[in-house]
């Protein structure tokens, strides 16, 4: 296995154990090696979000959408980052996109309804 994959798995393991700050260390190293890998950026975005580094999480999810514009989870996660930063109008658009690409998701629908009602 490659060192990049090992770093990615290490980051995922830290996330699974609730150690998001430690996950960022491994995932940042993995991202430097393979910056075009959406799975690495997603895990890093999740880690940043969990430690309330919302603008950094936002950047990761935006980059995923540059690579994969129809990624429903990236739209949802970006919406959450934007909402946490008080950018509700922009969050609505990403929640709508997430719901469009995955209409069966109750989580996406609830997030959209909540931000629209705020």
Segments from the language model and where they lie:
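Structural signature of tandem alpha-helical TPR/SEL1-like repeats
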Residues: 16-29, 51-63, 85-97
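Helix-start (N-cap) detector for alpha-helical repeat units in TPR-like alpha-solenoids
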Residues: 4, 38-39, 72-73, 106-107
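Mid-chain, well-packed structural core segment of small domains
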Residues: 59-84
